[in-house]
């Protein structure tokens, strides 16, 4: 099990607090001037295809050593072993945490409750492979004998965000099948998705472990109604619906052949489930072989994370740097900025991955924490973000550490587009780190013929303080394997921070209260009677809603 160690009570935390008295005045320009080898010392590679440059951070070798000491004193290495060995580190749900087993390409035994889970994992993968090949090849036919052309994945949260993100990221590897994702219980989402589709050539994947998730099952029933309005016969449902679930009884009652039910296990958390049967939509989108490459890429990082000393461990380094800003510099958010349009949902995916995992205010002892835990995660692709929110990152009053991610090789070599994209990628981290001093601004104004009076009016607005920290992650090319690398890298970063913060990263009780209250409110919306059972605000809103729609 994970130890219950309050990080703020360790000697390392005290040392970092003392170190911060000096470190808060670090200047990146000075750090680079003082050390010509800074890039070499503060960058690392993962395999042949990924470079991680963390040299533009407000850290020195001393800072990093103190951070590594914090990891040691909170027994991070022991926690890593506990996760990989199948210990029930998700204590509040009494579960192991083994998304790593789903991509365990070495096939070494992984024991849960005395049983090796790998035979079951491999059996589901084989079933996914056969199903995928039948659909992609056109062997699988709909109820009128036509090939399936469109797949609609109906899920929410981890059953949607991960598959959608990966399918978009790997669009260059697309099969002949067209993928669609429906998540929101807002009827608009499914109505607009189904408008251009033909029931004869559409297959639905219903992704719900329990087959009871409100949003997913509401959309699933609407999809079935849409299908039957054309197909007529309930028996035809079996050829157009498959389930990613463990509830065979409910799946069968829905009309789905349980031979087309793909199971996963309670040791797979929703936000880590794209590696499981939930990833069936990915396999259909890009082909099963590419899905396996995705698993391979993640497994490479798993091996690195489990077997590499902390000082050279990429997820550990990224996690500790993030913690340095979160807990000592007082930053409240991190931005993920992929300079690759295919990665346009990457930040949103890790918004869930990070904020649902580490958005906790109670430690593993059950006590309220008195230190900061999970940061706010957000971001958009470059260069779009440059014309939206980079202003605040450059000249605002908040410190926002940023991760810049870009491929050296584009899937779309159109003119000089990629060179222009990458010139912006390189320029932004340089600008954020080093800024533009007043004397430079004045020199530019002078060269442009500005008078002293004109300069006095504008100089202050043109100065960039710099000293904004960034990581740069340069990928040779976004492939299934390198995407698997990246995803696993961020997953393990989240785990490391949760261990050090002494919180449980694999439950999500914070999502429950709103669902409970929604279930209580739902029957109150069935008629036009005035409601007075809630607080005055909620009563007022419900009654206004009823009045508006009357």
Curated annotation (Swiss-Prot):
Cellular component per GO, a single term: cytosol
Pfam families: PGI
Chief site of localization: cytoplasm
UniProt keyword Isomerase, yes or no: yes
InterPro entries in alphabetical order: G6P_Isomerase, G6P_Isomerase_C, Phosphoglucose_isomerase_CS, SIS_dom_sf, SIS_PGI_1, SIS_PGI_2
GO MF term list: carbohydrate derivative binding; glucose-6-phosphate isomerase activity; monosaccharide binding
Catalysed reactions listed for this entry: alpha-D-glucose 6-phosphate = beta-D-fructose 6-phosphate
Keyword Phosphoprotein on entry: no
Top-rank taxon, per record: Bacteria
Gene Ontology terms describing biological process: gluconeogenesis; glucose 6-phosphate metabolic process; glycolytic process
Location in the cell: Cytoplasm
CDD domains with a match to the protein in the record: SIS_PGI_1 (cd05015), SIS_PGI_2 (cd05016)
Keywords: Cytoplasm, Gluconeogenesis, Glycolysis, Isomerase
EC numbers on record: 5.3.1.9
Pathway the protein takes part in: Carbohydrate biosynthesis; gluconeogenesis; Carbohydrate degradation; glycolysis; D-glyceraldehyde 3-phosphate and glycerone phosphate from D-glucose: step 2/4
Active site: 356 (proton donor), 387, 515
Family: Belongs to the GPI family.
Alphabetical list of HAMAP family matching this protein: G6P_isomerase
NCBIfam families with a match to the protein in the record: PRK00179.1 (NF001211)
Functional summary from the UniProt entry: Catalyzes the reversible isomerization of glucose-6-phosphate to fructose-6-phosphate.
Name used for this protein in its record: Glucose-6-phosphate isomerase
Gene of this entry: pgi
């Amino acid at each position: 099990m994970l130890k219950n160690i309050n990080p703020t009570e360790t000697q390392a935390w005290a040392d970092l607090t003392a170190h911060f008295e000096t470190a808060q005045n670090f200047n990146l320009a000075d750090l680079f001037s003082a050390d010509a080898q800074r890039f070499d010392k503060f960058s690392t590679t993962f395999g042949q295809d990924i470079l991680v440059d963390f040299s533009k951070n407000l850290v020195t070798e001393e800072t990093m050593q103190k951070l590594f000491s914090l990891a040691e004193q909170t027994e991070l290495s022991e926690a890593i072993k506990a996760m990989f060995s199948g210990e029930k580190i998700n204590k509040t749900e009494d579960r192991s945490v083994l998304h790593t087993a789903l991509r365990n390409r070495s096939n070494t035994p992984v024991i849960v409750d005395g049983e090796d889970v790998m035979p079951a994992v491999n059996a589901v993968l084989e079933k996914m492979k056969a199903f995928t090949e039948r659909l992609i090849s056109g062997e699988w036919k709909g109820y009128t004998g036509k090939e399936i052309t469109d797949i609609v994945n109906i899920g929410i949260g981890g059953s949607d965000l991960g598959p959608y993100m990966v399918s978009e990221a790997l669009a260059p590897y697309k099969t002949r099948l067209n993928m669609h994702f429906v998540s929101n219980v807002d009827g608009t989402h499914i109505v607009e998705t189904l408008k251009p589709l033909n029931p004869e050539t559409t297959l639905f994947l219903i992704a719900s472990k329990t087959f009871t998730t409100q949003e997913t099952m509401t959309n699933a029933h609407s999809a079935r109604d849409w299908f039957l309005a054309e197909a007529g016969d309930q028996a035809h449902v079996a050829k157009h619906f498959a389930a990613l679930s463990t509830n065979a009884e409910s799946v069968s009652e829905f009309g789905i052949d349980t031979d087309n039910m793909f199971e996963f296990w309670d040791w797979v958390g929703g936000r880590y489930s794209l590696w499981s049967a939930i990833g069936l939509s990915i396999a259909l989108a890009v082909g099963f072989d590419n899905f396996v490459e995705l698993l391979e890429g993640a497994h490479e990082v798993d091996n690195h994370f489990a077997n590499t000393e902390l000082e050279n461990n990429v997820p550990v380094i990224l996690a500790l740097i993030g913690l340095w800003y979160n807990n000592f510099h007082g930053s409240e958010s991190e931005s993920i900025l992929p300079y690759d349009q295919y990665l346009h949902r990457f930040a949103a995916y890790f918004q869930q991955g990070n904020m649902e995992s580490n958005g906790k205010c109670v430690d593993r002892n059950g006590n309220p924490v008195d230190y900061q835990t999970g940061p706010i995660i957000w971001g958009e692709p470059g260069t779009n973000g440059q014309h939206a929110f980079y202003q605040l990152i450059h000249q605002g009053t908040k410190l926002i550490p940023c991760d810049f991610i870009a491929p050296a090789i584009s899937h779309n070599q159109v003119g000089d587009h990629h060179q222009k994209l990458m010139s912006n990628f390189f320029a932004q981290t340089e600008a954020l780190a080093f800024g533009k001093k007043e004397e430079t601004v004045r020199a530019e104004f002078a060269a442009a013929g500005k008078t002293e009076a004109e300069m006095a009016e504008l100089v202050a607005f043109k100065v960039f303080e710099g000293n904004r920290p960034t990581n740069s992650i340069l990928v040779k090319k976004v492939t299934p394997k390198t995407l698997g690398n990246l995803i696993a890298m961020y997953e393990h970063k989240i785990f490391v921070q949760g261990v050090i913060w002494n919180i449980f990263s694999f439950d999500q009780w914070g999502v429950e209260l709103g669902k409970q209250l929604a279930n209580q409110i739902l029957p109150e919306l069935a008629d036009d009677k005035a409601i007075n059972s809630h607080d005055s605000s909620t009563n007022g809103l419900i009654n206004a809603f009823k009045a508006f729609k009357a």
